[in-house]
């Protein structure tokens, strides 16, 4: 049987696999904000990125290792392909963290070996022990993944796993890379690994899965029953294609059905000991932060964190809930951090009151960031009678999107009505040469006119593919959250902003999307799965020695 830590370890890969969602690219400050919140949430491991991808990715992982890596905090992990260049870059990036891990991988399915790696099984059997041993010479905590394990020949898979453990791997990850398996198949795969790998008792079994068939969470729960003790997941289930296994769904399934799962941990069914170390009351805030910063809107009927997750429309259901919530609710909304708390902050509230409330909400801002947040708070308070926690969340989350901005919006002025053509006047500052230009455009509506004017000024070709707006809170003076997604060269970039004026919010969101596009094209990143190992050269290391 594999090594059993006595509970489930939560491995969060929002900043690595989650960021690979189309349009979900994050800047350094955004990644730091999410990493800090993941630490508050209580995840065991943060996979901070793929350091070899680009100098920007290396810097982000290194900064997270410095700022978030603590003795009593999460393990900071980086991803590396099974090559010395990748592994060395990963080690250098995570080295500042007291608790660090190198996560290296290679594909084991025949379809990947033939068409992607152009390698034989014999090649893989040589590469795995050599690269795991090299990683082990740098750090003690090594995770090894057999990419596309669920479509690999079982006997070959067992052989690869045995070699990886013998070379020093302490965690063996079994990915369902394309979301192919069903729960019973995935559970049997984990059980068979436990039976057929002689040294599996020296490593923790981890699972990683995608949601292409909508089965990722179900697969993971079946894996837990068969001995998996680390779950690799993302906030809101974001990730490539249909996404990854959802952290909040997994955690709350284990929380709500603890009496069922306790027996698989050799506990009494009524044992009160939690199955994870997650602080569930941080779930909603974490979900909103990730949604705001990535621009990936959470569907209303999403389990646990969707807007309708605790809503009841049916009169029969409403009557039952009013009499006893347990009639139709299996989770207390407060357990995941939802509350009806409305604070009495307004235009007369001072800096200390705002700081105190932000600290209560878990935000630890520097003096400079607090000054910026307070200025935004006062501006909003002049336009809105009451400031709620959701308003403060919107202020803080938008604030961390500002760094690395080539363009800054200076002026938005719109004229529209049923008897006139919508016209927008926009002034845009180019921070690279400190020049400001103004353009006027006509559109089919005020937002279209704003986007046309911004395109004239920015001169960054793109296609607008999504515009959405939703209310942050109730009331006619509520903040409107706007998400805009643009496309260029088959890549998608998101922008997000909130304002009491949705046209101003749309303008800011569009500028944010343009800034992401420009910044992303400067990064010139490589993809951990799609780019060949031949890209793993020492050139990167020489440029990032410091």
UniProtKB/Swiss-Prot annotation:
It catalyses: 3-methyl-2-oxobutanoate + acetyl-CoA + H2O = (2S)-2-isopropylmalate + CoA + H(+). Residues 8-271 form the Pyruvate carboxyltransferase domain. Its EC number is 2.3.3.13. GO terms for cellular component: cytoplasm. It holds the Pfam family LeuA_dimer. Transmembrane segments: none annotated. It comes from the Bacteria. Residues 408-546 are annotated as: Regulatory domain. Pathway: Amino-acid biosynthesis; L-leucine biosynthesis; L-leucine from 3-methyl-2-oxobutanoate: step 1/4. Mn(2+) binds at residues 17, 208, 210, 244. GO terms for molecular function: 2-isopropylmalate synthase activity; acetyl-CoA C-acetyltransferase activity; manganese ion binding. GO terms for biological process: L-leucine biosynthetic process. Its cofactor is Mn(2+). Gene3D superfamilies: 1.10.238.260, 3.30.160.270, Aldolase class I. It is found in: Cytoplasm. Keywords: Amino-acid biosynthesis, Branched-chain amino acid biosynthesis, Cytoplasm, Leucine biosynthesis, Manganese, Metal-binding, Transferase. Catalyzes the condensation of the acetyl group of acetyl-CoA with 3-methyl-2-oxobutanoate (2-ketoisovalerate) to form 3-carboxy-3-hydroxy-4-methylpentanoate (2-isopropylmalate). Homodimer. Belongs to the alpha-IPM synthase/homocitrate synthase family. LeuA type 1 subfamily. This is 2-isopropylmalate synthase.
């Amino acid at each position: 049987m594999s090594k059993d830590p006595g509970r489930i370890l939560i491995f969060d890969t929002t900043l690595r696999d989650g960021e690979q969602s189309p349009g979900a690219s994050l800047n350094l400050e955004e990644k730091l904000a999410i990493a800090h919140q993941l630490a508050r949430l209580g995840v065991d491991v943060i996979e901070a990125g793929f350091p070899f991808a680009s100098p920007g990715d290396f810097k982000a992982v290194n900064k997270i290792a410095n700022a978030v890596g603590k003795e009593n905090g999460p393990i900071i992990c980086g991803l590396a392909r099974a090559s010395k260049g990748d592994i060395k870059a990963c080690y250098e990036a995570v080295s500042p963290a007291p608790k660090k891990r190198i996560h290296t991988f290679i594909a084991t399915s025949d379809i990947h070996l033939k068409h992607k790696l152009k390698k034989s099984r014999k090649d893989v059997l040589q590469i795995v022990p050599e690269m795991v041993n090299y990683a082990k010479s740098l750090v003690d905590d090594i995770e090894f993944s057999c990419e596309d394990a669920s479509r690999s020949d079982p006997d070959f898979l067992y052989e690869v796993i045995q070699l990886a453990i013998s070379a020093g791997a302490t965690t063996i990850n079994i990915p369902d890379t394309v979301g192919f398996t069903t729960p019973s198949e995935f559970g049997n795969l984990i059980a068979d690994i436990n039976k057929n790998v002689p040294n599996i008792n020296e490593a923790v079994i981890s699972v990683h899965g995608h949601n292409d068939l909508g089965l990722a969470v179900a697969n993971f729960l079946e894996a837990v029953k068969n001995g998996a003790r680390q779950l690799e997941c993302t906030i809101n289930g974001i990730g490539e294609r249909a996404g990854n296994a959802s952290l909040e769904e997994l955690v709350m399934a284990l929380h709500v059905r603890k009496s069922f799962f306790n027996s698989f941990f050799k506990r009494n069914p009524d044992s009160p000991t939690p199955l994870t170390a997650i602080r569930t009351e941080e779930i909603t805030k974490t979900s909103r932060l990730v949604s705001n910063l990535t621009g990936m809107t959470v569907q209303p009927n999403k389990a646990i964190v969707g807007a309708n997750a605790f809503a009841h429309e049916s009169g029969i259901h409403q009557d039952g809930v009013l009499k006893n919530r347990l009639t139709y609710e299996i989770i207390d909304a407060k357990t995941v951090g939802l509350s009806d708390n409305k604070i009495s902050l307004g235009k007369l509230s001072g800096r200390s009151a705002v700081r105190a409330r932000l600290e209560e909400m878990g935000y630890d801002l520097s003096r400079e960031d607090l000054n910026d947040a307070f200025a935004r708070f006062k501006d909003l308070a002049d336009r809105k009678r009451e400031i709620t926690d959701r308003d403060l969340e919107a202020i803080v989350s938008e604030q961390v999107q500002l760094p690395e901005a080539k363009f800054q919006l200076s002026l938005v002025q719109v004229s529209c009505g049923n008897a006139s053509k919508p016209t927008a006047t926009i002034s845009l500052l180019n921070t690279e040469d400190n020049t400001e230009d103004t353009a006027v455009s006509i559109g089919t509506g005020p937002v279209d006119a704003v986007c046309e004017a911004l395109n004239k000024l920015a001169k960054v070709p793109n296609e607008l593919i999504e515009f959405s707006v939703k209310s942050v809170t109730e009331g006619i003076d509520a903040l409107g959250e706007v998400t805009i997604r643009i496309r260029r060269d088959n890549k998608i970039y998101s922008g997000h902003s909130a304002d009491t004026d949705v046209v101003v919010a749309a303008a800011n969101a569009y500028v944010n999307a343009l800034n992401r596009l420009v910044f992303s094209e400067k990064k010139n990143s490589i993809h951990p799965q799609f780019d060949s190992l031949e890209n793993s050269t020492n050139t990167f290391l020489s440029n990032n020695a410091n």
